[in-house]
């Protein structure tokens, strides 16, 4: 089990790399995360929903993503509550206290999934969540040491040296663990190191002498990896590699933004100057503004208005700019969004931005499906997925954005296009991941001679580079011996 001293220490990436190394060696390997809290998710082969990192790890392992890889997924709807997803299906919304009481039920789902994986695979790399040293979360823990103790799983602790304080993080985390939990930690991995590792050696010697546990590797900082992010927005809000005549793309960093992996292909595109715009920052000039998915559409609509984005969008459209709304962003572009059942917050109805003539009602049932099709205006093929709890109706849907294959072998429309051709809205995530669709959409937004980039191929190359790096910078013999 890979646990971290902090969030974003590198657990997800390390598990992905280890899965790829095991796959190369001919080992039947699977990733597993007992409990995940994330707004980036993926649709599985069995029609459920799991964290995006586990879907990436499944690619690394060479297996289909399915719900047993992440049996408990929490999707925050506010600072105090989250939608609880068990075995891929949304069960309920709970606040933090109520979920704490629900954990024994959730743990049963975790153990059931783990048992099925254990029966099917030779090796399972388990990813922890956050840090095991959160004293207030120790009772009924199902994500870190609570799980490791229950199934007798060895632990490797990873820490991010780029943030500073790595030795304090590692020794401090150990100090917060019980004796049995400390004994379960078999060694350390130091992640994101820059510089001459020989200068780090005195610290490594001290750490091993202090704890009696080996340092199993020092992994260098890998720039430019094209891998799906677990939850947080990328550290660099602007993609820096764009050409001088690049298309300017801007996305507001909504408080409840979901599936921002939709934009990874744009961030990697050499002809796109991509910006996330945080609260309080003035949006830069743009050719294309994209309203992203949201786990709280009403709250994020209020945020957009409070930040002046309604006026920004109005001015942008007046001068010929293009706008795309994806999932929750699509819903925001309509007349109104009704939440009669309190799916995302208090029941109620809010006025949308009003640029497309449709209205959305949030429902208790969630749509989860992988889709294929094409853009309605040209032959650009797409392959993506839907994750939403809304039903949208209105005249604007008569001019769809996409034409998708349905279950009967026919075609069904999705989304809407404005009459002037400046606005596209769709429920489909992963819109830019397919090379042909990405090139077509960038050309529609104003990019001359738009190139097609193969984002899945970039991701595959990054997984190979990651595995190559781990093969060099982890002491793999010592690693395998340490975890038994």
From Swiss-Prot:
Pathway linked to the protein: Cofactor biosynthesis; adenosylcobalamin biosynthesis
Pfam families per UniProt: CbiA (PF01656), GATase_3 (PF07685)
Active site: 327, 429
Origin: domain of life: Bacteria
rRNA processing recorded as keyword: no
Membrane spanning residue stretches: none
A GO term for molecular function: catalytic activity
InterPro entries found in the cross-reference section: Class_I_gatase-like, CobQ/CobB/MinD/ParA_Nub-bd_dom, CobQ_GATase1, CobQ_N, CobQ_synth, GATase_3, P-loop_NTPase
Keywords (A to Z) from UniProt: Cobalamin biosynthesis, Glutamine amidotransferase
Gene3D superfamilies named among the record's database cross-references: 3.40.50.880, P-loop containing nucleotide triphosphate hydrolases
One GO process term, biological-process aspect: cobalamin biosynthetic process
Domain GATase cobBQ-type: from-to ranges: 246-437
Chain's role: Catalyzes amidations at positions B, D, E, and G on adenosylcobyrinic A,C-diamide. NH(2) groups are provided by glutamine, and one molecule of ATP is hydrogenolyzed for each amidation.
Family the entry assigns: Belongs to the CobB/CobQ family. CobQ subfamily.
The protein's name in its UniProt record: Cobyric acid synthase
Organism: Paraburkholderia phymatum (strain DSM 17167 / CIP 108236 / LMG 21445 / STM815) (Burkholderia phymatum)
């Amino acid at each position: 089990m890979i646990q971290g001293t902090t969030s974003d220490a590198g657990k997800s990436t390390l598990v992905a790399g280890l899965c790829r190394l095991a796959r190369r060696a001919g080992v039947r390997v699977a990733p597993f995360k007992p409990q995940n809290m994330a707004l980036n998710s993926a649709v599985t082969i069995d029609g459920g929903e799991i964290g995006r990192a586990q879907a990436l790890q499944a690619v690394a392992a060479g297996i289909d993503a399915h719900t047993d890889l992440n049996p408990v997924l929490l999707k925050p709807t506010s600072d105090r509550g989250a939608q609880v997803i068990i075995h891929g299906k949304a069960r309920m919304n709970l606040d933090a206290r109520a979920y704490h009481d629900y954990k024994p039920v959730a743990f049963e789902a975790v153990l059931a999934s783990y048992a099925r994986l254990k029966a099917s695979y030779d090796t399972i790399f388990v990813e922890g969540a956050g840090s095991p040293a959160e004293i207030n979360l120790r009772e009924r823990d199902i994500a870190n040491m609570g799980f490791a103790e229950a199934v007798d799983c060895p632990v490797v602790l990873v820490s991010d040296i780029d943030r500073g304080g790595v030795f304090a993080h590692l020794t401090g985390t150990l100090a917060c663990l019980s004796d049995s939990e400390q004994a379960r930690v078999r060694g350390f991995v130091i992640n994101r190191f820059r510089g001459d590792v020989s200068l780090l050696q005195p610290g490594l010697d001290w750490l091993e002498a202090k704890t009696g546990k080996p340092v199993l590797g020092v992994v260098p900082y890998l720039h430019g990896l094209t891998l799906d992010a677990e939850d947080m927005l990328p550290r660099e809000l602007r993609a820096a590699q764009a050409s001088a005549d690049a298309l300017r793309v801007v996305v507001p960093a909504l408080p409840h933004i979901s599936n921002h992996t939709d934009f990874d292909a744009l961030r990697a595109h050499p002809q796109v100057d991509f910006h996330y715009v945080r609260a309080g920052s003035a949006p830069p000039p743009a050719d294309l503004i994209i309203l992203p998915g949201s786990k709280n559409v009403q709250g994020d609509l209020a945020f957009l208005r409070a930040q002046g984005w309604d006026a920004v969008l109005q001015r942008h459209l007046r001068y010929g700019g293009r706008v795309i709304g994806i999932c929750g962003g699509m819903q925001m572009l309509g007349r109104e969004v009704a939440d009669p059942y309190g799916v995302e917050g208090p029941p109620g109805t809010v006025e949308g931005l009003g640029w497309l003539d449709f209205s959305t009602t949030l429902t208790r049932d969630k749509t989860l499906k992988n889709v294929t099709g094409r853009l309605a205006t040209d032959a650009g093929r797409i392959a993506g997925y839907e994750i939403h709890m809304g039903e949208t109706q209105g005249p604007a849907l008569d001019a769809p954005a996409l034409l998708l294959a349905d279950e009967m072998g026919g075609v069904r429309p999705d989304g809407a296009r404005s009459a002037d051709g400046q606005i596209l809205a769709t429920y489909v995530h992963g819109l830019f991941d397919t090379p042909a669709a990405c090139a077509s959409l960038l050309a529609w937004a104003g990019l001359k001679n738009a190139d097609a980039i193969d984002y899945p191929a970039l991701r595959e190359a990054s997984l190979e580079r990651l595995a190559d790096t781990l093969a060099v910078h982890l002491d793999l013999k010592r690693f395998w011996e340490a975890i038994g």
